[in-house]
Swiss-Prot record:
It is found in: Cytoplasm. It holds the Pfam family HIGH_NTase1. Coiled coil: none annotated. This is tRNA(Met) cytidine acetate ligase. It comes from Clostridium botulinum (strain Okra / Type B1). The gene is tmcAL. The keyword Aminoacyl-tRNA synthetase does not apply. GO terms for molecular function: ATP binding; ligase activity, forming carbon-nitrogen bonds; tRNA binding. SUPFAM superfamilies: Nucleotidylyl transferase (SSF52374). InterPro entries: Rossmann-like_a/b/a_fold, tRNA(Met)_cyd_acetate_ligase.
Amino acid sequence: MNVSAIVVEYNPMHNGHLYHIEKTKKLTNCDALVCIMSGNFVQRGFPSILDKWTKANMAISNGVDLVIELPTLYSLSSAEFFSFGAVSILDSLNIINSICFGSEIGNINVLQDIATTLLEEPLEYKILLKNYLDKGISFAKARNLALVELNRDNKIMSENISKILSLSNNILGIEYLKSLLLLNSSIKPFTITREGADYKDENLHEEYSSASSIRKYLKENKNINILKDFLPLEGFLEFKRLITKGYNFSMEDSMINYIRYKYISGYKNLHNLIDVSEGLDNRIYKSLEKSFTYDSLVGEIKSKRYAYSRIGRILCQYFIGFENYDLNSLLKSTPNYMRVLASNERGLKVLKEVKKHSSINIYTKLPKNTNTLLSLDIKATNAYSLLNNNIRFNEDYFRSPTIIKNTIY
């Protein structure tokens, strides 16, 4: 069985994601497509606009065969750990033949060369990197400059490397490739050129609009019909159904009062979070005292040193309660389970293959005794239930995966 995989967030699913699914199937000629997906919180540091079960059902309705949840610890981590968490789970299934991701460059060989250099860190690269860091240059910029200089004899590569490393999907793709190399994985990587608007673009465009623009529209408007051209048909119909039944679209603004209340109640242990460097915790506390919206809070905190997404992830982690866990130890280990959110009949065949070839724990219902990584997912869903009136406290214990039969794909 030829099984391919994609790593997604679907916040929310749009036409660009449908394009990714269709191109992956064509490029890999796979018999089945597995999707590992962020749950109720996403990597840019937001609550997901739709709960993870609704997102998973949409994915199955649009051509995915099996949806696995990416543990929240990884979905709220940097690109490096986000990618490693996803790839390590896929690799441990022992049945995934390929992975396909979108990138701005659309050239797997260039991304592979960069990933190899960053992982192996040849001596010349280490020296160049140290020289730039000693000048007080940020790590990301120092890394870019070191790579440019390392490739100075290759004029085309040297001139384009800074641009390549400035684009988010290229960066994520490089991290997927690094993870595959680190794990010595047999999974073959593919990339497709990303189509449509940049993820930061908040304006609706023909055919391929960004998830950001769709969220912005839903936040400000109630006429869902405008989005018909930007969403897969099944997704559009599901949105209409959700609006009819009064579904809560979870937005970052809905977290602000809970975060502020936690702070004024004396929970001042932000320093325990990995992304909180010295002094950042106090910067956040001061901003919490005078900011009353999510955007104003992040705007008050962010700087050249602290990116918007990093601040967003910290605030989500604090909202959930990550600061009470030993995150360093968790991130150094690899997940030993997969949580199934939805499947079709072809996906059930994939699960049978996993059971034959892998010792990984497969969870369709939660066990009574959960490990730390899984307990963080439960805490995340409980926190999310404060933002979404369709999700109950301890919803993880009530929900079983949706099995969708007779899908057209």
